[in-house]
Amino acid sequence: MKNLDINTFDNIEDIPLGSSEQDPYDFFTLSDRNVMNSDMKKNIVQWNSRYSYNQLKNKDSLIMFLVEIFRSLFVSNCIDKNIDNVLLSIEEMFIDHYYNPQHSRLKYLIDDVGIFFTKLPITKAFHTYNKKYRITKRLYAPPTFNEVRHILNLAQILSLEEGLDLLTFDADETLYPDGHDFNDEVLASYISCLLKKMNIAIVTAASYNNDAEKYQKRLENLLKYFSKHNIKDGSYKNFYVMGGESNYLFKCNEEATLYSVPENEWRHYKKFVDYDTVQEILNISEKCLEKVIKDFGLCAQIQRKEKSIGLVPNKIPSLNIKNEQKNYMIKYEVLEEAVIRIKKEIIKNKITAPYCAFNGGQDLWVDVGNKAEGLLILQKLLKIQKKKCCHIGDQFLHSGNDFPTRFCSLTLWVSNPQETKACLKSIMHLNIKSFIPEVLYENQ
């Protein structure tokens, strides 16, 4: 940990705060003006509102693009011979996109590709992964979607040589199983260790208004670990929780409990959305969800909160009852259908306020605000550049609420807390000379 180089900015002037000009997309004004302009902010809004069949499972465009390249090499039986030349070409495209994200060749080939805030060493990442799993020696099983996802994660981790100032996490399926509370001492130890070197935030869709106790309950075991290891050195001050995507901010005090941060300390970094617009988004969503329940005969209910609305099963499935009926479960494809219907209606009503309609796997939620806005608030509050911020999450498809963070942060796409631990272990040991990235395949 001693060698993890974390740089901070002494003055707010060190980071330009973007244009003061107001436009319909000003909630995406970023901390370094030279990376994102108004057209790119508009592009984020358009992709946040995109709806198509292609957003279904494992349809990430960049990963599928690489899968097809590797698969063509595999089919032609020349992956072992030609892989270096192919990786060099891919890396050149990545570098071109890093310098010119709006007009790169990669952008023309993959129109929804995110922004690269670091140069991705895909060649080194592939060979690291191949050294352990020997992809190039396989005869009948071509590289898969998840393998390419892991390789891109490795490339992103290997690009962090300058260190990080802010590490953010999704909650469910990233830090703990969906619907559960945090309960992993090893993961807590990794987060605690990194907290001594950087700011860490959990950016979650969970919306309990400003009720710090409810967030405290979900994270109780993590905060207990902080009470033993992060109070004396004051590193507990580096921990944040952003609830409701971007609507409620909490910090940790010296008793390792959460408290609500006064709005006057951070609300000016957030786009103002008036009450009528909030209600319009929720009303449109509620009408769509009522129609979905009727059309598909769902055993589900609508839950409406201050700035969010959700479709949840009437009963959560039990893992212990084998013969229990499962007809109350909502099919993944039905949730996707509902997300697309809601986005379509919001677009028709020409609403430009930040929002997020996402498929949670077992339920669906629509929030006023989104994780991109949540990350941008933290970046501005802490005066941190986007290339020094990394978000770890499991919902990076177009219908997932982590997707917008690709336009304002580095990202690592995990599928479970075990993969999160592997990523953190690699980040902790990144600048050690004998460092070998932790490679964790999905089924291990």
UniProtKB/Swiss-Prot annotation:
Activity control mechanisms: At physiological pH, allosterically activated by ATP. ATP binding is a prerequisite to magnesium and substrate binding. ATP binds to 2 of the subunits in the homotetramer inducing a closure of these 2 subunits and the release of the C-terminal loop, thereby activating the enzyme. In this conformation, the enzyme can bind IMP and magnesium which ultimately leads to the release of ATP. At pH 5, ATP does not have an allosteric role and is dispensable for magnesium and substrate binding. Inhibited by phosphocholine and D-myo-inositol-4-phosphate.
**UniProt similarity note:** Belongs to the ISN1 family.
Q: Mainly resides where?
A: cytoplasm
Residues annotated as coiled-coil are none
| Molecular function GO terms recorded | ATP binding; IMP 5'-nucleotidase activity; magnesium ion binding
Q: Does the keyword Cytoplasm apply?
A: yes
What name is this protein filed under? IMP-specific 5'-nucleotidase 1
Protein species of origin: Plasmodium falciparum (isolate 3D7)
Q: Which cofactor does it need?
A: Mg(2+)
| Active site per UniProt | 170, 172
Subcellular location per UniProt equals:
Cytoplasm
Binding of ATP occurs at 132, 150
Instruction: Supply the InterPro entries for this chain.
Output: HAD-like_sf, HAD_sf, ISN1
Free-text function comment from the UniProt entry: Specifically, catalyzes the dephosphorylation of inosine monophosphate (IMP) into inosine. By dephosphorylating IMP, plays a role in the purine salvage pathway. Does not have phosphotransferase activity with IMP as phosphate donor and adenosine as phosphate acceptor.
| Comment on pH dependence | Optimum pH is 4-5.
Q: Which UniProt keywords apply?
A: Allosteric enzyme, ATP-binding, Cytoplasm, Hydrolase, Magnesium, Metal-binding, Nucleotide metabolism, Nucleotide-binding
Pfam families found in the cross-reference section = ISN1
Oligomer status and interactors: Homotetramer.
One Gene Ontology cellular component annotation?
A: cytoplasm
| Outcome after substituting residue 172 to A | Loss of catalytic activity towards IMP. 1.2-fold increase in affinity for pNPP and 8.6-fold increase in catalytic efficiency at pH 8
Give the gene name: ISN1
| Reactions mediated catalytically | IMP + H2O = inosine + phosphate
Binding annotation for IMP: 170, 172, 178, 204, 207, 308, 363, 371
| Consequence when changing residue 413 to L | Loss of catalytic activity
What PANTHER family does the annotation carry? Answer: IMP-SPECIFIC 5'-NUCLEOTIDASE 1
